[in-house]
Amino acid sequence: MSNQHILLTSNLLPVGSNISTWWNFGSMLLTCLILQITTGFFLAIHYTANINLAFSSVIHITRDVPHGWIMQNLHAIGASMFFICIYIHIARGLYYGLYLNKEVWLSGTALLILLMATAFFGYVLPWGQMSFWAATVITNLLTAIPYLGSALTTWLWGGFSINDPTLTRFFALHFILPFTIISMSSIHIILLHNEGSNNPLGTNPDIDKIPFHPYHSYKDMLMITIMITFMLLILSFSPDLMNDPENYSKANPLITPQHIKPEWYFLFAYGILRSIPNKLGGTLALFMSIAILMTAPFTHTSYTRSMSFRPLTQTMFWILIATFITITWTATKPVEPPFISISQVTSIIYFSFFIINPLLGWVENKLSTLNN
């Protein structure tokens, strides 16, 4: 019997010996998901999905329910932590060429879309001022779809404006989608272990493998402990750090906030949407800002999998990270110069990464053959 079979029969999953800390974010995401479902369940017990009572029920949870403030703040901070981890997880995948495992990458992109939908529905539930107006603006984008747009929007709203039926169905969707995420995550993990995890070098991991437990399981536990400690620090000292002050006012359809914006983790997509003056064009760009990730496995041209030994592509990668942060920052600002120009330039750079990368792959291939 081979060593791998011995390890598997001993319930010890064989994993590459050189996988770094960047490989811990999958287990951190699973921890976030468990935390969100647990806190979400306790919040759902006390929440009322009614436009007249939703805002009051959230206040009731934080003030009157024993430990309700912990549940409510942990759920809000947990959502932010979920997105921090998933963005790092995606960046790691892009950097180390893990997208070449197509099934895992495409299932992961589908998971990201599901997660964004869940977070959006959840943001509407407190029925604060920013919740209401963000929901109005984002759902209104459906009207940009030719022919079907208006009918789709009315169907989603359950009426001719955002009202009680909208809140009820958003609550139902916010409750059911995490279970879809669990099943999709299971598929994602099964597909991953079909081939096994890759490593920072991009080489065949079968050459040198060690048991997952205790070597990598303790590393996972360390990162999970750091993440939970960080969340508890925010919860204890600055629970409103990630929240919008506007959302502490009850939703009022008659008063529009000076600057409508979603939660920080959607700001990069919202910034791309806002940078295009055309409604349909902006909606397409918003969708493509996520969907373009699906093109990565099909446009890889380099002989080398990882970016570790590709300085040109590395430069483009760090430009992408800087661009992502800049778009997020500009989306927090009002729609006026110079923020309009900055968001337009950064949006072009964001999409150009996925076009220039294959070209740089060819250039690097030529350079490597010349050196040989």
Curated annotation (Swiss-Prot):
SUPFAM superfamilies: a domain/subunit of cytochrome bc1 complex (Ubiquinol-cytochrome c reductase), Transmembrane di-heme cytochromes. A ubiquinone binds at residue 193. Its cofactor is heme b. GO terms for cellular component: mitochondrial inner membrane; respiratory chain complex III. GO terms for molecular function: metal ion binding; ubiquinol-cytochrome-c reductase activity. It is a multi-pass membrane protein. The keyword Manganese does not apply. Pfam families: Cytochrom_B_C, Cytochrome_B. The chain crosses the membrane at residues 25-45, 69-90, 105-125, 170-190, 218-238, 280-300, 312-332, 339-358. Heme b b566 binds at residues 89, 188. Keywords: Electron transport, Heme, Iron, Membrane, Metal-binding, Mitochondrion, Mitochondrion inner membrane, Respiratory chain, Transmembrane, Transmembrane helix, Transport, Ubiquinone. Heme b b562 binds at residues 75, 174. Binds 2 heme b groups non-covalently. Its main location: mitochondrion. It is found in: Mitochondrion inner membrane. One of its GO terms (biological process) is mitochondrial electron transport, ubiquinol to cytochrome c. Heme 1 (or BL or b562) is low-potential and absorbs at about 562 nm, and heme 2 (or BH or b566) is high-potential and absorbs at about 566 nm. Belongs to the cytochrome b family. The cytochrome bc1 complex contains 3 respiratory subunits (MT-CYB, CYC1 and UQCRFS1), 2 core proteins (UQCRC1 and UQCRC2) and probably 6 low-molecular weight proteins. This is Cytochrome b. It comes from Dendroaspis polylepis polylepis (Black mamba). The lineage of its organism: Eukaryota, Metazoa, Chordata, Craniata, Vertebrata. The gene is MT-CYB.
